C-alpha cells in the first residue's frame, strides 16, 4: 500500500476528529461536565470548547486551501456538548466529501497561502498541510486532552490514539 498525501492529511484529520469526538463523549459523562466546557490549562489559553472549535476550523482551512476557496471563519460560539458534536460533524462531513485523487493532485500545487494576518506565502498544499494544518490540528486535539486530564477526567493514552489505530486493529477490537 502506498501512503499518499490524502492519507497524511484527510485520513489523519478524520482520525483526529474521531479522537476528539471520543474526548467530548467522555467529558460529557463526568459529574462536572458543564464546567469542563470552559476549563482551561491556564488563564490566557483557550477553553476546552474552543479547542474543539479550533480543531474543526483548522480542517476547514486546509480544505479551503486545497480547493482554492477563501476560508470564512465561523465564530466560536460553542456552549454545549451538542454544539461540540455538531461542529465535529460539520468538519467530518467536509472531509468525507473530498476526492482522494483530487486531494493528492492538489498537494503538489503551489498557491499563495494565508498563514496569519500579514503573512501569505507561496507554498504547496502538502507543505501547508504538513507545516501548518496538521501540527495545529494535533495541537488542539492534545490541548483538549490535556485540559480534561488537568480537570481529573479519567483518560489514558488509548483514549487519544484509538481512532488513529483502528485501521491496524482486527475488526473485533
Indicate where each model-derived feature is located:
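Amphipathic alpha-helices that form helix-helix packing interfaces
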Residues: 13-16, 20-23, 27, 55, ...
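Basic/polar N-terminal segments that are highly enriched at the extreme N-terminus
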Residues: 1-10, 22-28, 166-173
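Long amphipathic alpha-helical coiled-coil segments
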Residues: 68-82, 148-156
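Alpha-helical scaffold segments that form or flank carboxylate-/histidine-based iron centers
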Residues: 2-16, 35-57, 75-84, 120-136, ...
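Conserved alpha-helical segments that form or flank metal/cofactor-binding pockets of metalloenzymes
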Residues: 44-72, 91-101
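Hydrophobic/aromatic-lined pockets within catalytic cores
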Residues: 21, 25-28, 56, 60-63, ...
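Acidic interhelical loop/turn segments
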Residues: 31-38, 97-129, 161
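C-terminal or internal capping secondary-structure element at the end of a domain, subdomain, or sheet
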Residues: 126-171
Amino acid at each position: 500500500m502506498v501512503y499518499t498525501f490524502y492519507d497524511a492529511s484527510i485520513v489523519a484529520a478524520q482520525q483526529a476528529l474521531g479522537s476528539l469526538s471520543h474526548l467530548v463523549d467522555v467529558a460529557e459523562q463526568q459529574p462536572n461536565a458543564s464546567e469542563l466546557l470552559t476549563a482551561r490549562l491556564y488563564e490566557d489559553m483557550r477553553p476546552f470548547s474552543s479547542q474543539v472549535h479550533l480543531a474543526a476550523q483548522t480542517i476547514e482551512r486546509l480544505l479551503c486551501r486545497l480547493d482554492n476557496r477563501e476560508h470564512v471563519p465561523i465564530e466560536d460560539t460553542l456552549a454545549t456538548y451538542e454544539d461540540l458534536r455538531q461542529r465535529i460533524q460539520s468538519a467530518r462531513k467536509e472531509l468525507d466529501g473530498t476526492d482522494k485523487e483530487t486531494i493528492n493532485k492538489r498537494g503538489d500545487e503551489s498557491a499563495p497561502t494565508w498563514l496569519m494576518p500579514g503573512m501569505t506565502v507561496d507554498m504547496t498544499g502538502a507543505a501547508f498541510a504538513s507545516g501548518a494544518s496538521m501540527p495545529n490540528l494535533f495541537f488542539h486535539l492534545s490541548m483538549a486532552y490535556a485540559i480534561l486530564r488537568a480537570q481529573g477526567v479519567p483518560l489514558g493514552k488509548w483514549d487519544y490514539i484509538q481512532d488513529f489505530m483502528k485501521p491496524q486493529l482486527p475488526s473485533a477490537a
